[in-house]
Curated annotation (Swiss-Prot):
This is UDP-glucosyltransferase 1. It comes from Beauveria bassiana (strain ARSEF 2860) (White muscardine disease fungus). InterPro entries: EryCIII-like_C, UDP_glucos_trans. GO terms for molecular function: hexosyltransferase activity; UDP-glycosyltransferase activity. It is an enzyme of class 2 (transferase).
Length: 461
């Protein structure tokens, strides 16, 4: 991917040798992967980057040529995800997730960020600093909201926010994020959405709204007008100077009130397999084109193979026109010994989506946003089984955009999976639509947009 030079005026105003980019990611794969891709591209384009991320990414950060700073891990993430999974009410589940995963860790991440910025200023006192954050890091929000500056700084660094997840800000045209309601555009529904937004702020989200204010105030934030009485999802995506929504507009609901700080820039393109790519033993059998390929993945976070991956293999076991590739999502992972693997299926512990999906006719997945976007950029229609975290919202967007079948459950039956796969294979509209959006995304040149924003805000400092 070659760098864009379509804004020479801005480019000429910035001395790149005097620019330091500090990238920030919360310690979860789905939030770190998109930032790591961007960090790698920035290094290739000649930028000096420090990356604050989970300890798990130390080696990968070094491999792409960036300086690494560890972010404190979640406190017992397994406990948190288990507790969240049993909360039936979507509003209450959203409230608990905001508190446990995002608001509570703010102080520790702020301390890590300030220490990193002060190190940068000591080592490179004359460099301009631009922050490249992502919506759920949150340790930068006190700084954005008027907290005292890190030592050595006389003004707040400019900040660009990467939003590599569904657009979840409050809107008159859609229900609150998490309620998984696809808007229908009617005046009656808009009135219903208005009431739902109000009820959530004073009801299920009241605790997280209050805690958000308390934590930010304790950490020195002073611009509380941007926080007072607001949904935390609105706050996290609008405190930086600009938010870059990492998808093409066609994947989101039609809204008349997109926040003025938000720019849709598309997703990064597929990544070519590295020269060191080692193909699994079944590779040539699968890619020879003699049968249609169905790729199945449970993702990397909510990994219970009995919920989707195993049922999908068995649902298609009698199809001699199909070969199934089941990606387990974790290096070294294996299915339990008692699980029978059908003769038309292959399993692999870990395999790049971008390596496998170009050969796929259907992608069956748990509707994680990262996997969903891999399906889009590779032009593969999907069967979406979203049941936890933000996955039902992602599946809704796939249905709305016309790129796949929404099973409306994270634990589909074999019959549901088979019907979804059959519908996609028999109806060309899904493939046609996903190819249209793939082309829309390619034309947006996401990485060039990220670089332009960096240069734009650096020039303003």
């Amino acid at each position: 991917m070659s760098p864009s030079r379509s804004e020479p005026l801005i480019d000429n105003l910035v001395d790149r040798s005097n620019l330091k980019i500090v990238a920030l990611a919360s310690p979860a794969d789905g939030h770190t992967f998109p930032l790591l891709r961007i960090v790698e591209e920035l290094v290739l384009r000649g930028y000096d980057v420090t990356f604050l991320a989970s300890e798990d990414y130390r080696a990968r950060t070094a491999a792409v040529g960036a300086y690494f700073v560890p972010v404190p891990p979640y406190d017992d993430i397994q406990r948190i995800t288990t507790e969240l999974s049993v909360i039936a009410d979507p509003g209450e589940r959203m409230n608990a997730a905001m508190i446990e995963l995002f608001i509570t860790p703010t102080a520790g991440r702020m301390a890590t960020l300030y220490a990193a910025l002060e190190d940068v200023k000591r080592e490179k006192p004359l460099h301009k600093v631009v922050l490249l954050t992502e919506s759920f890091f949150l340790g930068d929000h006190p700084l954005f909201l008027g907290a005292p500056l890190p030592k050595g700084f006389t003004r707040r660094p400019r900040a660009i926010n990467i939003h590599a997840c569904s657009y979840g800000l409050s809107s008159v045209d859609s229900a609150p994020f998490g309620l998984t309601i696809i808007p229908d555009g009617t005046a009656e529904s808009r009135e219903k959405y208005r009431k739902l937004h109000s009820d959530m702020l004073t009801g299920s989200l009241a605790e997280s709204v209050a805690l958000q204010k308390k934590v930010l105030t304790e950490l020195g934030a002073t611009n509380m007008d941007e926080v007072e009485g607001r949904n935390p999802l609105d706050v996290i995506a609008t405190t930086a100077d600009v938010t870059l929504q990492m998808c093409p507009p066609s994947l989101e609901y039609r809204r008349s009130d997109i926040h003025p700080k938000v720019r849709f820039i598309g997703a990064l393109p597929p990544r070519a397999p590295p020269k060191t790519f080692s193909a699994p033993p079944f590779w040539n059998t699968v890619i020879n084109g003699s049968k249609r390929v169905v790729v199945v993945s449970q993702g990397t976070v909510a990994v219970r193979y009995d919920q989707l991956l195993v049922p999908a293999m068995h649902a298609l076991a009698d199809r001699d026109d199909i070969v199934v590739v089941a990606i387990l999502g974790q290096k070294g992972a294996e299915l339990p010994g008692e699980v029978a693997i059908p003769s038309n299926a292959y399993t692999v512990d870990y395999l790049s989506y971008d390596a496998m999906l170009p050969y796929a006719s259907v992608f069956v997945l748990n509707a994680g946003y990262g996997g969903f976007m891999h399906g889009i950029v590779n032009g593969v229609p999907m069967v979406l089984a979203g049941g936890s975290e933000d996955k039902p919202e992602v599946a809704n967007r796939g249905e709305f955009a016309g790129v796949g079948i929404n099973l409306r459950t994270g634990t589909p039956s074999q019959r549901q999976i088979r019907q979804g796969v059959d519908e996609i294979l028999s109806n060309p509209k899904y493939k046609r639509r996903v190819k249209e959006i793939q082309l829309e995304n390619e034309k947006m040149k996401a990485m060039d947009s990220v670089e332009k924003e960096i240069l734009k805000w650096a020039a303003m400092d």
